[in-house]
C-alpha cells in the first residue's frame, strides 16, 4: 500500500479517536446561555460592552444587560443577574443620578438602559434605581415632540421620529406605567407606535 495513503489513514484515525474521546460540552446548555457567557467573557465588566473605553450609559449596553436579566429569569443562574447589577451600580451614583447621561440632550437612547432597573428595583428595593427610573420618566414627559405629538429622537434631531426610538421608549413607558400605576402611559406608547406606523409603513416600497 502507498506510504502516503497509510500516513493519511493514520492521521484520520488519530483525529477521529481524539474527537470521540474529547470532553463534550453539555448538550443541555442552550445557545442563549453560550452566547451570554461568551459576551461576559469578552466583556468582563459590562461597561466594556461595544468595546467602550470607559463607563457610559448606552443603549447597546442596555440591550445586552436586559438580555442577561432575561437569561437569569429563564435559567435561575444568578451570574447573569449580578452582571446586570454591576452595570447599573457602576453608572448610578449614591443619589440615584445616572453618570454620563446628559439630560438636556433629550436623547431617547438614554431610556433603553432604564429597562434593566425594574428588575433590580424589584429585587433590592434600592431607591437609587427608582430615582433613576423617575429621571427617565421625567425626560420622556418633557421630550420635544413633532406637531402631531411624536417624540423627537434627540434634541439635535429636530422633528425626527426614529423606529428604534419606539423600541427604546415605548416598552419603558408601558412598564413604568404598569409598575407605578400610571396607565396613561399605555395610551402614550400606543399613540407613538401608531403615529410612526402611519408615517413609515408603505407597501409600495416593497420590491420583489
List each language-model region with its residue ranges.
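Well-ordered alpha-helical segments within folded domains of soluble proteins
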Residues: 57-73, 105-122, 162-178
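Bacterial Sec-dependent N-terminal signal peptides
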Residues: 1-27
